[in-house]
């Protein structure tokens, strides 16, 4: 008899995201619930393209797990040098490795749609000045969405006017026009954006994302467990 297990895969991705939050807070001073905020911004932007169902769930999982290789990268760097500036090093030198490792790791997760190169290219800039010099039309849509959402959250500025000015200033530079338009379509005023600060976004996140338990064989379950182990074992 074939052994199988029923799993809420998106809920598990949320748990992995929490583990990543703890690690990012320790090493790179990223504020709490970063992955979930990136996921919330991403799925709100997705409405612009009418992304629904399996695609929306896979976008949310990619967003929740976009920094999945952080511990793997930091662990390797610490083996070389016990004193490193992780925040500076990640942002300036080794972003490409963080993306390469993350893309490889994510293949262990049972997505329903094709998410190839989403994690690999999630730090690319629309004008081709990112780590792999890919321009916006060479980058998967999900990667472009996550890149904008990730950047907005890392900025950490709650001023709606500042965010709008920043996006318009970097339109067709850091971000493509479609994604800028999608963000401004999703968050039309400061009140809609403020839920990211008051914590209410998390309830809204789980209300929007399609969730249901799926049945997986033991090999898939082991792959998922191995993925989680890479995050917490450092």
What are these regions (language model features)?
Residues 2-234:
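Histidine- and acidic-residue-rich, metal-dependent catalytic cores
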């Amino acid at each position: 008899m074939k052994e199988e297990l029923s799993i809420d895969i998106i809920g598990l991705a949320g748990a992995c995201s929490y583990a990543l939050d703890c690690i990012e807070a320790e090493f790179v001073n990223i504020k709490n619930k970063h992955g979930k905020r990136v996921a919330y911004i991403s799925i709100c932007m997705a409405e612009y393209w009418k992304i629904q169902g399996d695609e929306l769930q896979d976008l949310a999982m990619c967003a929740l797990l976009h920094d999945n290789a952080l511990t793997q990268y930091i662990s390797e760097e610490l083996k070389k040098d016990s004193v490193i500036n992780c925040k500076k090093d990640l942002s300036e030198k080794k972003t490409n490795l963080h993306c390469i490792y993350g893309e490889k790791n994510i293949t262990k997760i049972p997505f329903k749609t094709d998410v190839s190169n989403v994690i690999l290219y999630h730090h690319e800039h629309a004008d081709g000045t990112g780590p792999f010099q890919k321009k916006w039309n060479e980058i998967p849509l999900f990667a472009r969405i996550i890149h904008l959402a990730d950047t907005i959250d890392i900025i950490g500025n709650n001023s709606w006017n500042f965010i709008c000015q920043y996006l318009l200033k970097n339109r067709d530079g850091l971000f493509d026009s479609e994604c800028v338009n999608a963000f401004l379509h999703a968050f039309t005023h400061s009140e809609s954006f403020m839920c990211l600060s008051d914590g209410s976004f998390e309830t809204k996140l789980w209300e929007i994302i399609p969730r249901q338990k799926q049945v997986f064989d033991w090999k898939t379950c082991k792959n998922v467990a191995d993925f989680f182990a890479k995050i917490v074992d450092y």
